[in-house]
A protein has these predicted regions:
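Hydrophobic, well-ordered beta-alpha structural blocks that scaffold small-molecule cofactor pockets
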Residues: 1-115, 119-126, 130, 140-147
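S-adenosylmethionine/decaboxylated-SAM
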Residues: 104-107, 113-128, 141, 148-322
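N-terminal pre-P-loop "Q-motif" helix
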Residues: 135-139
Length: 322
């Protein structure tokens, strides 16, 4: 990184996740959250972004943000201060590519930088908001490429506004060539169990089913299933699946999905789950409470000797059916 001093922008979950897998010797962190300046997060002192005004020629800024819209918003702030991508700032997804690629190669996958770059560009610059981490969407694309020879449909459970699926479908021909099932209530959470963070109960209600439907109108193999999983799963036509992506955040829905799809997953197929990450103890109060029900459901469902591959950079877990 050109030998300059390194500074982080963003003192939330993105910083905590990346510091576990891609530790970087940051000098300090900036964050515009009111009241955060002067505190310490992950061992780093937090300052106001104003500090960067006079630092442009002396530092390289790394954007630590979980969602592409947040990355884009920070990049806009940096551009207004005269910073330029690749010259004196990058985003942490580029670090994630470097740490995840060798792990995928060790599993027999062939990670591709061109696919990563396309996922990154679509996530940041398309009109469809993607709320999945850039590297997480790319990881899904690489797994779909790996499952090219596996028989079966594709399912994505937990769609929100459709951004992740939109990027995947525009990057990966495997996704376009097979039935691609999108399952969601398209109305936010129904109810939370005792092991889910109660303060997240109102999340994901800002969504319009008709708008999501319009996004995928020109993808002939995309099928949308609207409703709670306990309502839609019994109505699904009996199919085999090569790949299932689960991003429903909560314990009970994840449990229901695992019970339904695992028996219908073809040998060699893959289940990919989001929010399978345990945040470090003592996370700052401003950091949203992590969803922990997904990890609990996975641990309860699988036999104890089942290999689960963890990618804390993006809070994903992978399970292949052997």
């Amino acid at each position: 990184m050109s030998g300059k001093r390194l500074v982080g922008f963003g003192a939330g979950l993105g910083l905590l996740q990346t510091s576990q897998t891609s530790p970087v010797n940051l000098e300090y962190v900036v964050d515009g959250t009111p009241g955060l300046a002067g505190s310490s997060v992950g061992g780093f002192t937090v300052y106001s972004p104003d500090r960067l005004t006079s630092e442009r020629d002396r530092v390289t800024v790394i954007i630590y943000a979980n969602t592409p819209p947040s990355v884009a918003a920070i990049a806009k702030q940096l551009s207004a201060l005269g910073y330029r991508l690749g010259k004196n700032y990058i985003d942490s997804s580029l670090l994630h590519f470097e740490t995840i690629s060798p792990r995928l190669a060790s599993l027999g996958l062939q990670p591709c930088r061109d696919r990563f770059n396309r996922c990154r560009a679509l996530s940041l610059y398309s009109n469809v908001p993607n709320m999945t981490q850039i590297a997480g969407t790319w990881l899904m694309v690489e797994l779909l490429e790996y499952c090219r020879s596996i028989h079966g449909d594709i399912a994505e459970c937990g769609v929100f506004k459709g951004g992740n699926a939109f990027v995947v479908l525009n990057t990966c021909d495997v996704a376009r060539q097979r039935p691609y099932h999108l399952l969601d209530s398209f109305a936010g959470f129904d109810k939370l169990s005792d092991c889910d963070p109660q303060q997240r109960a109102i999340d994901f209600r800002d969504v319009s089913f008709s708008q999501v439907s319009d996004i995928f109108a020109n993808f002939q193999n995309v099928v949308l299933h609207k409703g709670l999983f306990e309502e839609t799963l019994p109505r699904l036509e009996e199919r085999k699946y090569s790949f299932v992506y689960m991003d429903c955040d909560l314990y009970e829905p994840t449990k229901a999905l695992l019970e339904y799809f695992w028996g219908r997953l073809s040998p060699g197929g893959c289940v990919m789950l989001h929010d399978c990450w345990q945040p470090p103890a003592g996370a700052p109060a401003h950091v949203p409470t992590a969803f922990t029900g997904t990890l609990r459901a996975l641990r309860e469902f699988l036999p104890k000797d089942t290999e689960v591959l963890s990618f804390p950079e993006t809070t994903h877990a992978l399970v292949f059916k052997r």
